[in-house]
Amino acid sequence: ELASQLGVSRMPIREALANLEKKGLAESVPYAGTRLVTLTKDDVRQIYIARTALEPVAAKYACEKITDEDIQNLKEIHAEYIRIVRQEELDAIDVYQQNRLYHFSIYKISQLDRICAMIESLWDNLSFFKLIYGQKLLEGRESRERMIEEHQSYLDALKQRDSERISHLLAQNLKKRTEN
């Protein structure tokens, strides 16, 4: 049915659904088809606990390997994030994508490919949740400015090559989200 609605063959649809299943975002239901997985509060909590364990490690290693060119790239990504977040009409998808680009640009510098893949999987599991609830988080001006300040604090720690500081900041901010 989906293939005919989209005007494509069944093969790309099957591949896309298999990919979603592999990432834990969808599940096959015998005699019914495929459906999206519903995350419980506990699922979200566990994902944030795992992110809190992994992301500060990747950021710490990134801080030890970061170049001036990397910092310049992050400044540009952050500037675009600020522009997007401060728009009158906020687009949750744009915010999510730019936020993801910022974080993964940091983690990629670590060269810890397996850890980065695990982090990416955790983000993928939360992507729909973050798009829905992330919009609510960014409704107020104060909340938006806090997110900008968080990103700026990471950038400042990276510029100073302060690996302990960036690790601490990320862990602290992720822990807050776990508690909420």
Where are the regions that the model predicts?
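Short linear motifs at protein or domain termini
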Residues: 1-64, 114
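Hydrophobic, amphipathic alpha-helical faces that serve as interaction scaffolds
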Residues: 50-66, 100-140
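Secondary-structure edge/capping motif, primarily at the C-terminal ends of alpha-helices
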Residues: 61-62, 81-89, 133, 158
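Amphipathic alpha-helical segments enriched in hydrophobic/aromatic residues interleaved with Lys/Arg
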Residues: 72-88, 94
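Inward-facing hydrophobic residues that define packing positions of alpha-helical scaffold repeats
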Residues: 78, 119, 170-171
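C-terminal all-alpha effector/ligand-binding and dimerization domain
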Residues: 131-180
